[in-house]
Design a protein with these regions (language model features):
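Asp-based, Mg2+/Mn2+-dependent phosphohydrolase catalytic module
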Residues: 1-36, 53, 69-83, 90-136
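Substrate-recognition/cap helix-loop segment adjacent to the acidic, metal-dependent catalytic center
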Residues: 27-38, 43-62
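Short beta-alpha junction loops
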Residues: 42-47, 88-91, 111
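Short hydrophobic/aromatic-enriched beta-strand-loop microsegments
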Residues: 58-64, 104-108
Length: 136
């Protein structure tokens, strides 16, 4: 993703979208080259904490005890960047971003623009039918 200079962008990932990346540490390292702040946002705080610890990610923000909508709103208010970009998967992610003043970018588009590899699981199991296949 070729964004503005690093002092102008806050980049947030929805946890499910971030799990789609094949090499999460490389995504964070690359994003830091052109973003001032990089972090994860999701409603399930325990899942975020576990994922961050498992992958030893060094992030600037996490959702805390807030839901996704409130986290987006508060992070936007506290970060002094011109641009706030939220990478997500669902229509709910898009709605949350747009209603809190963030730009929404689908994970596939972000990966393509930035050259970030997605897991095979992401492409094979995207959408409703993919989730059904996961059950069996």
């Amino acid at each position: 993703m070729n964004g503005p200079t690093g002092t102008e962008t806050t980049l947030g990932f929805e946890l499910a979208a971030f799990k789609a990346f094949d090499r999460p540490n490389e995504v964070v390292a690359d994003a830091r080259t052109w973003s001032r702040y990089v972090g994860l946002i999701a409603t399930d705080t325990d899942a975020v904490t576990s994922y961050v610890q498992t992958h030893e990610l060094n992030l600037d923000f996490l959702p805390g005890d807030r839901d996704k909508w409130l986290a987006l709103q508060e992070i936007r208010e506290k970060t002094n960047t011109d641009r706030h970009v939220f990478v997500g998967l669902s229509s709910d992610d898009r709605m949350a971003a747009e209603h809190t003043g963030w730009e929404f970018v689908p994970v596939e588009e972000a990966a393509e623009k930035a050259g970030w590899a997605l897991t095979d699981h992401t492409t094979r199991n995207s959408g409703f039918l993919g989730r059904i296949r996961d059950w069996f």
